[in-house]
A protein has these predicted regions:
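Conserved GNAT acetyl-CoA-binding A-motif
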Residues: 500-514
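Conserved active-site alpha-helix within GNAT-family acetyltransferase domains
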Residues: 514-538
Length: 542
């Protein structure tokens, strides 16, 4: 008897036919679309099968073939070797008496401070009632639906100054995020676990947290704040710097100073954390020249020199104090063309050891009363740079995974180790990279801390602040000939860092503050957890 002609069986038959064709011919993207149209029509489907629908019918042995790379959506999501999962904390009040003049949202609006309710991450948070477990689980499920296999997760905690929230809430929030990764793909009933239990489970989980990003104000990144963030598992801390002009900071009611920025940067860096800056060109009182000088000074002045950078041109949003100034004619924001000109000029001076992660906030244009409304500002800036024959030297523009997504030929690279040394915050930084033809395959950040470092674990030791191998994310325990992960390149960089720490600086120990999901990686390479500490240490004396 013939099988029932249901939509499901039609879809499965069509998907299997397409998979069999792909297994035998491996066409390009254009040919794939033709095949999908032809088979979908022949099987009587009302619509053309989508890539993720075909992926549902892949067999286990087919999951490791080139078919997955052809069908997976949004390859840029994992091109840097990891997946990001952004989660939003519940709305809470600004930690100071009055929000900054440009800052929208807040408890009275039902959103975290500085958010509008229309940002994708916030909308996911609202839909989940700000439940961290559900936010992480839903995001991982979204990735899987698109054909991805999320295994290494950089958790990004958004929603304002996280260290200013209730301490018990901070611990509960991070614990539940980790538990979602530990339980995935199965939603499980709530069960109380301590932070330490959740971290221990994640060391061997299918989905591992390789790092946690937290946002804070400079005056909420003192030594005791930093210690709390480290205990929670933070590996990258993003600071709302905005500008390096104290008068402008006072004018917008920022409530902190440039001195706070310098101190926070040093404390975080000395503790082994990565440091990111948020900068806001176009603030009231700042000129184009002053904005450009800020974007140059954060790299020329050794008191700053962040590892990561996000640039958010100032926007006028209804309901803010700045909106009232704009209505009264006392303020005008940077327009699209002005912002592009400024950013193109700034890109000329970005060093090779910074990653420019974003240059625009994710805000719908219809909400913006004045300011940059182009949603593709980064693409416009990149196109202008190419037209001028300028290649940005930042990490993001050179990393091999994104180069492959852009269609550049990276098939025959023979990366070599390069070392760049620079002073920062009273200590010494070494950017140890694997490069070829200016393509960046991976890097390691090694620090010799300043004399003011407060964490006992780092005193007298070299500190590995970051180790990253680029290219498509390869799940834990697997290998791919087409990718750079899991081929010993990380171990090569580690060995070089240990050699430099020992031979160049005479250090006898090297420590690292790894994400909880990466502890096993370092353990295999001779690192051991220090007693009652999240740090891992290896002796390197001859």
């Amino acid at each position: 008897m013939a099988p029932p002609s249901t939509t499901h069986s039609k879809e499965e038959r069509a998907a299997r036919r397409i998979i069999e064709i792909l297994m035998s011919s491996m066409p390009d993207r254009m040919e794939l679309n033709k095949i999908k149209h032809k088979v979908s029509e022949e099987e009587g489907l009302e619509k053309v099968l989508k890539d993720y629908e075909i992926l549902r019918y892949l067999k286990e042995d087919e999951m490791k073939t080139g078919i997955v790379n052809l069908l997976v959506g949004k390859k840029v999501r994992s091109a840097s070797g990891i997946y990001t999962v952004a989660v939003m904390t519940k709305p809470s009040r600004c930690p100071k008496d009055r929000p900054c003049s440009y800052c929208p949202g807040g408890v009275d609006y039902g959103t975290p401070q500085s958010y509008l309710g229309k940002e994708p991450a916030l909308m996911r948070g609202i839909q989940s009632n700000f439940d961290p477990y559900r936010q992480v689980m839903y995001r991982l499920t979204q990735y899987s639906t698109l054909g991805h296999r999320p295994s290494k997760i950089q958790l990004i905690i958004m929603g304002g100054t996280f260290p200013a929230t209730d301490l018990d809430y901070q611990e509960w929030f991070v614990t539940r995020c980790l538990e979602a990764m530990n339980d995935y793909p199965e939603f499980k009933p709530y069960r109380w676990r301590s932070l330490e239990e959740a971290q221990l489970r994640n060391e061997s989980s299918r989905v591992r947290c390789i790092g946690i990003t937290m946002e804070t104000r400079p005056d909420w990144a003192k030594e005791h704040h930093t210690d709390r963030m480290i205990r929670l598992g933070a590996t990258l801390v993003e600071i709302g710097v905005q500008t390096l002009d104290d008068e402008t900071l006072m004018r917008v009611n920022r409530g902190c100073t440039v001195k706070d920025v310098k101190e926070a940067t040093r404390i975080l860096r000395d503790s082994g954390l990565k440091v990111g800056y948020h900068m806001m060109p176009g603030l009231p009182g700042n000129t184009r020249e002053k904005d450009l000088e800020d974007l140059r000074r954060i790299f020329s002045d050794e008191d700053f020199r962040p590892d990561y950078l996000k640039i958010y041109p100032t926007l006028v949003i209804e309901g803010t104090e700045l909106y009232a100034e704009w209505l009264a004619g006392r303020y005008r924001a940077l327009g699209n063309d002005e912002a592009v000109d400024l950013l193109v000029e700034a890109h000329k001076n970005f060093p090779k050891w910074v990653r420019v992660a974003r240059i625009q906030r994710d805000v719908p244009a219809h909400i913006i009363r004045d300011g940059v409304t182009k949603s593709n500002l980064r693409e416009i800036v990149d196109a202008r740079l190419r037209m001028l024959g300028i290649r940005c030297r930042c990490i993001r523009c050179r990393e091999v995974g994104l180069a492959r997504v852009r269609g550049e030929d990276v098939s025959n690279l023979r990366p070599e180790i390069k070392v760049e040394e620079y002073a920062a915050g009273g200590g010494i930084e070494l950017f140890i990279s694997l490069e070829d033809q200016d393509f960046l395959v991976g890097f390691l950040r090694l620090r010799v801390p300043s004399e003011r470092a407060h964490r006992p674990e780092v005193i007298g030791a070299g500190v590995i602040r970051e180790l990253h191998i680029y290219g498509p994310q390869i799940p834990v325990g697997e290998k791919s000939r087409e990718a750079y992960q899991h081929h010993g390149l990380g171990a090569t960089l580690l060995s070089k860092a240990e050699e430099i720490a020992r031979d160049r600086f005479g250090l006898k120990r090297i420590v690292v503050l790894p994400g909880v999901g990466v502890r096993g990686y370092y353990r295999k390479r001779g690192y051991r957890r220090l007693p009652s500490s999240p740090y891992m240490m290896k002796r390197i004396a001859q």
